[in-house]
Structures are given as structure tokens and as C-alpha cells.
Amino acid sequence: MDKIQKTDHFYLIDGSGYIFRAYYALPPLTRKSDGLPTGAVSGFCSMLFKLLEDSKSDQNLQKPTHFAVIFDSARKTFRNEIYNEYKANRSEAPDDLAPQFEYIRKSVMAFNLPSVELPNYEADDLIATYVEKILKIGAKVTIVSSDKDLMQLYKKGVRIFDPMKNKFISEDDIKNKFGVDASKVIDVQSLAGDSSDNIPGVPGIGVKTAAELINQYGTLEKLLKSAHEIKQNKRRETLIENKDKALISKQLVTLKKDSPIKIELNDLILKEINKDKLYKFLREMEFNRLLSSAISTYGEPKLSSVSAGTKVLEKQKP
């Protein structure tokens, strides 16, 4: 198998983020033949199709040579062992979304793309691990996600594309959000906490104050070591009393860059679309509009006709 080259370009897709964006951004949809909810699957496929085509015309860096869709494996991860209340405020997936997860994973296979997930780890950790491996080789990577937690990975050789805003994130965007550069995002998050993930942080300290403190002291550890020097009584006492919460929060927000992923970089190579496989899936899901777009983009299937493909499927039914 060919070695990874410095000219290679990896696209790492936050698949879990795509799922929830597809579910909440689009109206409900069901498959007419059996009533299966398919709105999230349809939206996911449409976004993936668009991303694949847009990435092939990437003029800012280069076209992708490798591509992977990365998913969360389960709600519980190693972070729950560090802090039992981590994400405890999250509700279960909606009843009409849960049955769609299986088909979303099947859709990635239909597009002939590798998907990656690992028990006990979040998608963000796997992305961070791949980024670390890619940068060590000297190749480039584009992360596709609207998740602010991935901003800590921004550096030379790494781009972040926000599909919600349809733009690439810049260093200025990160500074505007966190008040610090990307290398210090973790420290700000450790102090400010994150209510959406139930990360405690330090009570009474928000992002703005956290940024001021980190810009002044450099790191969370240096700040906590010098907390007794802070002149504001309340702030000083709060930091001293909540030192452990801040340190635990840092463990929670720091992405793992050494997750034990078994799927290697070479396995992420971008393959040609298998038209028969993709069109069969789209027809089974009754995504007629997307099927039409796919045929227009990739050409007619190898089977004699689309209707012939339908006959084959009908014969397979019990």
C-alpha cells in the first residue's frame, strides 16, 4: 500500500454533528413504502453529496486524497469515569431519529467512504488522533464540523470548515469566540466550563473573564499556582476553592490525541463512487431527487437501466 505523502489532503467529517444538523434543520420525512422515518438520513446524504462535490473543486488548498466520516460510538465515554455528570444533562435521541442511525451508517458505505467510530471515545477524540498522525507526516487536513470543541486543533496544516456557516474558520473567528488563540482555547474552556456538556468550570467565571486571566497568566496551571496573588477578593477565593473543578474540566475538554484507532490513515483513501451501490441505496430509501442529482453527476449506473435495478430489488423481496 502506498505511503502517505506530504501532498496528501485528508477530509475528516464530524458525522455525529452532521446527523443532528440534518435532523433539526429539515422537516420530517418518512419512506412511503413502510413509514420509516428518513428525514435525517436524507439530509445527511444530501450534505455528504454536496461536500464531496465541493471538495473536488477546492482551489484554496488541494482536492482531498483521503476522506473519512467519524461518529460517536455511544453516550458514555472515558470522560464519564473522570466526571460522572459529564453530559448527564443530555436527553436521549428523539424516537424518530434513533432508528435512522443504522441507515446513516449504511449511507456512508453507499458513498464508498470509510466510517470510523470507537467505543469509549467521542468522534472529536478520533479526529484529534488522526490530525496528530497526519501532521506528523506533514500532510494537510480539513476538519468539517461546527463543533467549537474542535477549534483547539486549529494550527498550521489544519483547516476547519463550518458547514452551518458555510465558511472556513479563521484565527480571528477563534479569538472572537474565546478571546485567545487556538492554543489556549482549552484553558479558557477549563475555566468557563460548558453547560451544554455539563462541564463545571469555575463558578462565576465566563469566557470573557477566563480569556483575560489566561492572556495574563499564560496557562490554567500557572493561573492556579498564582491565584493567591489576584487582587479581587471574590475572584481569588473562587479560583482557590474551585481549583479541582478547573483541573477536572481541563481533562474533560482536552481531546485525546492517542486514541487506539485500528483504522489506519491508508485505509481512509478516497475511492471512486460505486454507482450501482449508491443508486441502489438511494432507491431503497426512496430519495428520488437525490438519486436524480447523483445520476446527473456520476452518470448512468452500470446496470442496463434504473428500472432494471428496481426489478432486481423486487426479486430479492421475500
Task: Give residue spans per PLM region.
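Noncatalytic, basic helical substrate-engagement surface that gates or grips nucleic-acid strands
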Residues: D2-V144, K148-S170, K245-I248, T254-K262, ...
